[in-house]
A protein has these predicted regions:
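Bacterial Sec-dependent N-terminal signal peptides
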Residues: 1-12, 667
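Compositionally biased linear targeting/interaction segments
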Residues: 7-205, 210, 219-223
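Residue-level recognition of beta-strand termini and adjacent short loop/turns
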Residues: 60, 71-74, 101-104, 171, ...
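Exposed, low-structure sequence patches enriched in small/polar residues
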Residues: 155-159, 264, 316-351, 358-667
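Outer-membrane beta-barrel proteins
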Residues: 181-199, 253-260, 313-316, 544-554
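Outer membrane beta-barrel
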Residues: 194-289, 403-422, 573-588
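Surface-exposed loop/turn segments flanking beta-strands in extracellular/periplasmic regions
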Residues: 236-247, 292-309, 597-602
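Internal alpha/beta core interface subdomains
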Residues: 275-282, 286-323, 328
Length: 667
């Protein structure tokens, strides 16, 4: 069983297949991503779907859109089948839904069920909510077996990390919860954290109360359109699967994760004023971390770390108010929405901008306005958004053609002007922020034979203005190819190749010399799941090269890694897994990645450079239906250095080991 999610009582292969697919996508999205993102909310929601599957006879379009392996046409056909033929009597009626292929059905089965729906059902009574609602408490403790240099005199707290999460929910109707977190090195019930945890998140979310489709109080997240104006949700991107290039609007959602930046605090609501028209409004007022000098905000601090006095001085340094709304019309094959947002800083934001960032956000207030749209004509689906603001504009369009359930084509065009500002916008691109980027992306996915699947994509992009380590306007290419072979349910393998070409300043020339860089990545992965076992072997090869400052000699660097993963689920409620990784790279540019199973609602994809190996062991024990205990131990051993890290994070010696523990109580 995948530890980051928890599955209902179905066959091992059925529950593992969609979870392994999700692991693959998250791993690919993590690799090379400059912006760290925690997937806690998304993983928690999918885990809840495994325990409380969606009833297909009462499913809404938004509920089905949370499953990335379902296409828009499959969702519409599934809803139409229930509308035309009435309630399903068995889950196997999925085979009768047009465009629903066997592979998709296998992926969907763990998340759905079929139950009779009574006519005239309304919002549940308070008595039912209190009686049948479910409570969950999740406690986590991380213990490092090393001492960083910062603990000698700079870090203000102990080296332990711990968090506590409580959630009460009743189906999709009501969710209430609180989250507290203390990072390693932060004080606890002391100094600037006299109230205990360094970070707290409170949330209250009601859904489907008559015309009131959603009401959020406390901390919440927002996503509308394609993210050009507003998205604090998990963003999809370029992977070896077409499903991760599509984005479905999340609307208003709770914020229960330990992410200390990507959320709003206040009130938000969505009302269905007409059968086909929804109106949303929101207001947020929150303190944010940053540096304030002479009454001006010079930088925004996003990490949430407050370990040293210097970091603590950045805590709650200024306030940000946000107000805005969205109006969405959706009927049949047409969907049109308008989103607007206005930001107010309590003092001027004047960052000390480098030349490559001279057009970035600054000022005391600004706005964004955008219009998103979606239209389906036969097998064509057109989705897009156009946005503008205080500066610049952005445009994104996707055209997808579904020849059948086995053949798909996708074309994406994006134009993000170099001076377009958005504080909480994320969208498709080489970087997640929709600014200073233009490009065309073409992808094709085909399953011509029962056991074979092919994917290929080509992204040609350009940056109209400078970027970090690129001291001129530049361009690049990103090409991907993957072939997957699945001879039987318990055995699958794939090979993929990725080629990326970009321009970059030559090291040591201060930007005076800029040459292309060429990056080749190859991966082979074999997964075998006999009975209660899972075996997975991964082999990676990286090749990185750039011409020297004179343009004559290529500087070549290489990296390798081999990872072996094994897990076993006992007949009683105990599962164990072990993983070992060997890596050998020439430098940071040729670094490799190896994902590991983490604790519940977490995902871990560390990068490695240099020479060494890492091993980890994971254990899960369900003491009863109410209590679950997880533990993970891991150690990395470097063979080419005597210290790990630098500055306050420096660790003496060549070994880094830690123990993570988690206890969940459900009732």
């Amino acid at each position: 069983m995948t530890p980051m999610l928890e599955a209902q009582n179905i066959s091992g292969l059925q529950k593992e297949q969609p979870l392994l697919l999700l692991e693959e996508n998250l791993e690919q999205l993590s690799i090379g991503n400059e912006e760290e993102y925690g997937w806690e909310d998304e993983l928690e929601e999918l885990s809840r779907r495994l325990q409380e599957p969606v009833n297909l006879n009462a499913a809404t379009k938004r509920q089905l859109e949370q499953f990335p392996f379902l296409t828009d046409i499959q969702i519409e056909n599934l809803l139409a089948y229930v509308y035309i033929h009435g309630q399903m009597q068995t889950i196997y009626e999925l085979q009768l839904v047009e465009e629903m292929d066997k592979r998709t059905i296998d992926l969907l089965l763990p998340f759905v069920c079929v139950r009779a729906v009574k006519a005239g059902r309304g919002y549940p009574a308070l008595k039912s909510i209190l009686k049948y609602g479910k409570h969950e408490t999740l406690a986590r403790l991380d213990v490092p077996f090393y001492i960083r240099k910062g603990y000698e005199k700079n870090y203000l707290g102990p080296s332990l990390y711990h968090s506590l999460r409580y959630n009460f929910h009743y189906g999709d109707y009501l969710q209430i919860g609180v989250t507290g977190e203390k990072d390693a090195g932060e004080p606890f019930f002391a100094l600037h954290n006299r109230k205990g945890y360094d970070y707290y998140s409170f949330y209250f979310l009601i859904k489907n109360l008559g015309r009131l489709k959603a009401l959020a109080l406390g901390n919440y997240r927002l996503s509308f359109g394609q993210g050009l104006v507003l998205s604090t949700d998990f963003r999809l991107g370029k992977t070896f699967s077409m499903s991760t290039t599509e984005y479905r609007t999340g609307g208003i959602r709770k914020h229960s994760s330990t992410d200390e930046y990507n959320y709003f605090r206040g009130v938000a609501a969505t009302v269905g004023v007409l059968p086909y028209l929804d109106i949303s409004a929101f207001y947020s007022h929150r303190s944010m971390d940053g540096v304030v000098e002479d009454g001006e905000i010079t930088s925004i601090y996003k990490t949430g770390l407050h370990r040293t006095q210097k970091e603590a001085d950045k805590m709650n340094a200024f306030a940000l108010q946000v107000i805005g709304g969205n109006m969405t019309y959706e009927k049949n094959s047409l969907k049109v929405g308008v989103t607007g947002i206005y930001y107010f800083f309590d003092r001027p934001y004047k960052p000390r901008l480098n030349k490559y960032a001279k057009y970035n956000l600054h000022g005391s207030n600004f706005y964004n306005v955008g219009m998103d749209y979606r239209y389906r004509l036969g097998r064509f689906v057109w989705v897009g958004e156009a946005a503008t603001g205080s500066k610049g504009y952005a445009l994104l369009n996707r055209l997808k053609y579904n020849l059948s359930s086995d053949y798909h084509l996708l074309l994406v065009h994006r134009y993000y002007s170099y001076d377009y500002w958005t504080l909480f916008g994320r969208s498709f691109g080489e970087s997640s922020m929709p600014q200073n980027e233009n490009g065309w992306y073409l992808a094709a996915e085909a399953t011509p034979f029962a056991r074979w699947k092919f994917f290929a994509s080509l992204d040609m992009f350009s940056f109209p203005w400078w970027k970090y380590r690129i001291s001129k306007p530049s361009k690049g290419v990103d090409a991907m190819f993957q072939v997957t072979y699945t001879p039987r349910k318990s055995l699958s393998m794939y090979f993929n190749y990725r080629y990326k070409q970009k321009e970059r300043d030559v090291t040591g020339t201060s930007g005076a010399v800029i040459e292309p860089i060429y990056h080749h990545k190859l991966r082979y992965r074999l997964t075998y799941m006999p009975g209660r076992y899972i075996f997975r072997t991964t082999i990676d090869y990286n090749h990185f090269r750039q011409q020297d400052g004179e343009g004559y000699r290529f500087d070549r660097r290489q990296g390798y890694q081999c990872t072996q993963f094994c897990s076993y689920t006992f007949p009683f409620p105990l599962s164990v897994s072990v993983q070992g990784t060997w890596f050998h790279t020439d430098d940071y540019d040729s670094r490799v990645y190896a994902s590991e199973r983490g604790l519940l609602y977490t995902f871990y994809t560390p990068s490695f450079y240099g020479k060494g190996f890492r091993y980890s062991a994971h254990l899960r024990y369900d003491l009863s239906k109410n209590f679950m205990f997880l533990a993970k131990f891991g150690q990395t051993v470097y063979q080419d250095r005597e210290t790990i890290g630098s500055g306050n994070d420096e660790i003496p010696g060549n070994r880094k080991a830690d123990l993570q523990m988690q206890l969940r109580i459900k009732f």
